[in-house]
UniProtKB/Swiss-Prot annotation:
This is SsrA-binding protein. Its main location: cytoplasm. It is found in: Cytoplasm. GO terms for biological process: trans-translation. One of its GO terms (molecular function) is rRNA binding. GO terms for cellular component: cytosol. Athough the Valle et al., electron microscopy paper indicates this protein came from T.thermophilus, its sequence maps to A.aeolicus. The Fu et al., paper maps the coordinates of T.thermophilus to E.coli. It comes from Thermus thermophilus (strain ATCC 27634 / DSM 579 / HB8). InterPro entries: SmpB, SsrA-bd_prot, SsrA-bd_prot_CS.
Length: 144
């Protein structure tokens, strides 16, 4: 279960409350680009639309040998979850200030692409600064 790509920025910008594993519906050339690690999480998020969950603004680079089979790199991609998980998530996301952000994309042991979603609350700037200071102190103590 080695991660293809991890969204480290999300853990800095958001407080992660819960995590969920979801399948992701991809086209063939997207899988090839994903295996090559050509993914950018910047600005990506998950959103409900007509009772289904979609991952939006995730950039998967076009496969260089893909020709006409390549699709829009920032297209909406459907996330695959059980109905009871979708209902539970919908209730939580409707709360003010909570959002779903992708934390990690990887391939499971069966070779299927999975995305680890985090139910998150945005951090304020002063919270980020406080956390950065704590991390700097921890590193300084480790060096000694």
């Amino acid at each position: 279960m080695a991660p293809v790509l991890e969204n480290r920025r999300a853990r800095h910008d958001y407080e992660i409350l819960e995590t969920y594993e979801a399948g992701i519906a991809l086209k063939g050339t997207e899988v090839k680009s994903l295996r090559a690690g050509k993914v950018d999480f910047t600005g990506s998020f998950a959103r409900f639309e007509d009772g289904e969950l979609y991952l939006e603004n995730l950039y998967i680079a076009p496969y260089e040998k893909g020709s006409y089979a390549n699709v829009d790199p920032r297209r909406k991609r459907k996330l695959l979850l059980h109905k009871h998980e979708l209902r539970r998530l919908l209730g939580k996301v409707e709360q003010k200030g909570l959002t779903l952000v992708p934390l990690k994309i990887y391939f499971n042991e069966r070779g299927y692409a999975k995305v680890l979603l985090g139910l998150a609350r945005g951090k304020k700037a002063y919270e980020k600064r406080r956390e950065d200071k704590k991390e700097a102190v921890r590193r300084a103590l480790e060096e000694l």
